[in-house]
């Protein structure tokens, strides 16, 4: 691995905020210090040959920034009730993320009713682990996206503490109750619970009654104060599964600046028109549509009413979705922006990361295609090569 103060990437197609051009990139002390638009064969003084990455015509992109991904849950609990040590799962997952070109990951942790990693104890444990790992070492930049289920009344105090202790980077509000969001269609919630929990009609009726009882006791004023406190600390707030213009208006009233996964094109148009960032899932793009029949992400993006991509639950999809969008007619630099500078802006970090520009932190990936599939061959974080691979034949 290259760990020196200087590093040069030569002969690549550099994806900048305003376009793509072939050239060289020089990094010093973790900062992008020069960018030559025409590839140079001259040796840079002070940079040894072993600190040069010859991109050989590959793409040179900013490191990907993922603001919504819950894949860490499957790393800790790959099968129901089968938990692995968190530190082991985290460290192994980090290596996968570097290999997928993700240089900033906000791990999406759900604070809601349930067992395993979505329960309060394990969520708090994972957040503490992320904080300690961030302080000690890292291959990539880690953060926490707290997904708070509004009807999880007993978790409110923990959400307050996590925000006040500075352990949260991004907050979203979820309302997975019957008739709300992705369960807005009659019977959708009941069908989901019966399928995933293996319960009958009587049991699901009891679950619905209990959930609706909790939702009726939500203190919306306290919830609004929570989001205000988050925003005062520089934490972006998002809504989740907005299903109508009125839902967007409620989200705006709570200070949300990002709408995650709006369920229809009309809702995405409304949210974007109100100045919200609109975040859609990369798996939706790669697979050609929503897994549950909602908004087709490509439609909203080509319509110009969505500006952020996230991997949702499948980290490999983030890079693939960028090139899929290019094949759909979106210019490459605009597609790249959706997984780099746009999420950086949404988080208030665009002055440091998210694009290949002079003076920014050197979070960079080198990408080439194999069988028309984009693959990361080098990942650089803060000027250090944390991942590199080469085919043996």
Can you name each region flagged by the protein language model?
Residues 146-157, 241-246, 250, 258-260, ...:
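Active-site glycine- and acidic-residue-rich loops that bind
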Residues 165-169, 251-258, 273-279, 304-307:
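Glycine-enriched alpha-helix->loop->beta-strand junction motifs that scaffold or abut catalytic
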Residues 1-8, 14-61:
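Histidine-rich, glycine-flanked metal-binding segment
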Residues 274-284, 288-369:
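His/Asp/Glu-enriched, well-ordered alpha-helical/loop segment
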Residues 111-242, 312:
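Metal-coordinating catalytic core of metallo-dependent amide/deamination hydrolases
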Residues 55-127:
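Metal-associated gating/positioning segment near the N- to mid-region
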Residues 12, 340-341, 345, 357-393:
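C-terminal cap of metal-dependent C-N hydrolases
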């Amino acid at each position: 691995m290259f760990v020196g103060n200087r590093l040069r990437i030569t002969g690549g197609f550099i994806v900048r905020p305003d376009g793509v051009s072939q050239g060289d990139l020089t990094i010093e002390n973790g900062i992008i210090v020069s960018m030559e638009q025409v590839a140079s064969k001259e040796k840079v003084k002070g940079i040894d040959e072993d600190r040069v990455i010859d991109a050989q015509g590959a793409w040179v992109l900013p490191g990907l920034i993922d603001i919504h991904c819950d894949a860490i849950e499957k790393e800790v609990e790959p099968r129901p009730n089968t938990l692995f040590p968190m530190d082991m799962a985290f460290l192994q997952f980090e290596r996968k993320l570097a290999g997928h070109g993700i240089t900033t990951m906000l791990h999406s942790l759900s604070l809601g009713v349930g067992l395993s990693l979505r329960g309060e104890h394990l969520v708090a444990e994972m957040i503490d682990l992320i904080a300690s790992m961030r302080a000690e070492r890292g291959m990539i930049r880690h953060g926490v996206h707290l997904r708070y289920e509004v009807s999880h009344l007993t978790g409110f105090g923990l959400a307050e503490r996590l925000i006040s202790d500075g352990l949260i980077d991004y907050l979203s509000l979820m309302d997975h109750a019957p008739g709300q969001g992705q369960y807005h269609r009659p019977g959708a919630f009941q069908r989901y619970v019966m399928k995933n929990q293996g319960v009958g009609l009587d049991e699901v009726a009891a679950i619905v009654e209990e959930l609706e009882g909790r939702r009726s006791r939500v203190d919306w004023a306290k919830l609004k104060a929570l989001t205000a406190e988050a925003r005062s600390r520089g934490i972006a707030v998002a809504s989740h599964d907005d299903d109508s213009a009125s839902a967007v208006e409620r989200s705006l009233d709570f200070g949300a600046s990002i709408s995650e996964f709006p369920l229809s094109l009309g809702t995405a148009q409304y949210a974007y028109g109100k100045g919200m960032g609109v975040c859609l899932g990369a798996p939706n793009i790669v697979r050609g549509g929503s897994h549950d029949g909602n908004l087709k992400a490509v439609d909203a993006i080509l319509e110009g009413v969505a500006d952020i991509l996230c991997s949702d639950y499948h980290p490999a999809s983030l890079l693939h979705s960028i090139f899929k969008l290019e094949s759909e007619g979106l210019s490459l630099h605009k597609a790249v922006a959706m997984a780099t500078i746009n999420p950086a802006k949404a988080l208030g970090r665009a002055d440091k990361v998210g694009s290949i520009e002079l003076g920014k932190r050197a979070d960079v990936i080198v990408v080439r295609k194999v069988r028309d599939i984009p693959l990361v061959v080098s990942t650089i974080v803060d000027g250090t090569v944390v991942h590199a691979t080469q085919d043996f034949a």
